[in-house]
Amino acid sequence: MGFTDKQEALVNSSSEFKQNLPGYSILFYTIVLEKAPAAKGLFSFLKDTAGVEDSPKLQAHAEQVFGLVRDSAAQLRTKGEVVLGNATLGAIHVQKGVTNPHFVVVKEALLQTIKKASGNNWSEELNTAWEVAYDGLATAIKKAMKTA
């Protein structure tokens, strides 16, 4: 069964996240670093900081991650697969030393952040839609990493 219109709508219903981008960006990266402290060095905007601090670069990167997942949801519904619009994503992830466990950590942080942002609107169905969309994106990035 392919990605449905309803699943895409659930992924795109993240207005709560957009309304508090600074707070949820900090939460997202805090969860990433709690799960994988060594990942701090993978993010240029976190390298020289004592912890996760709000910054335009942090917010921009978080919005990019969430935006890529939303785009993946649309592609999964229309094409059944995710094709990266940014051909350099694979090379960037290789250059940074990203490995398979990093994708798991980011997925867990993403899902926890969405759960917090969704509040009473959170559901297993919402969680699954985001998870499937993220998995599609991760698969596309890993594929691009192999050819980078």
Swiss-Prot record:
Positions of modified residues (Phosphoserine): S44
Principal place of residence: cytoplasm
GO molecular function: heme binding; metal ion binding; oxygen binding; oxygen carrier activity
A biological process term (GO) from this entry: nodulation
Induction: Strongly reduced levels in boron-deficient nodules. Inhibited by abscisic acid (ABA) in parallel with lower nitrogen fixation in nodules.
Alphabetical list of InterPro entries matching this protein: Globin (IPR000971), Globin-like_sf (IPR009050), Globin/Proto (IPR012292), Leghaemoglobin-like (IPR001032), Leghaemoglobin_Fe_BS (IPR019824)
Keywords recorded for this protein, A-Z: Cytoplasm, Heme, Iron, Metal-binding, Nitration, Nitrogen fixation, Nodulation, Nucleus, Oxygen transport, Phosphoprotein, Transport
Residues that hold O2 according to the record: H61
GO cellular component terms listed in the entry, alphabetical order: cytosol; nucleus
Compartment list: Cytoplasm, Cytosol; Nucleus
Modifications the protein undergoes after translation, according to the UniProt entry: Nitrated in effective nodules and particularly in hypoxic conditions; this mechanism may play a protective role in the symbiosis by buffering toxic peroxynitrite NO(2)(-). Nitration level decrease during nodule senescence. Phosphorylation at Ser-44 disrupts the molecular environment of its porphyrin ring oxygen binding pocket, thus leading to a reduced oxygen consumption and to the delivery of oxygen O(2) to symbiosomes.
Domain Globin: 2-146
Modified residues (Nitrated tyrosine): Y24, Y29, Y134
Gene3D superfamilies for this protein: Globins
Database matches in SUPFAM superfamilies: Globin-like
Tissue-specific expression: Root nodules.
Annotated heme b binding sites: S44, H93, K96
Oligomeric and partner information: Monomer.
Reported function: Leghemoglobin that reversibly binds oxygen O(2) through a pentacoordinated heme iron. In root nodules, facilitates the diffusion of oxygen to the bacteroids while preventing the bacterial nitrogenase from being inactivated by buffering dioxygen, nitric oxide and carbon monoxide, and promoting the formation of reactive oxygen species (ROS, e.g. H(2)O(2)). This role is essential for symbiotic nitrogen fixation (SNF).
Family assignment from sequence similarity: Belongs to the plant globin family.
Protein name, UniProt field: Leghemoglobin-1
Organism: Pisum sativum
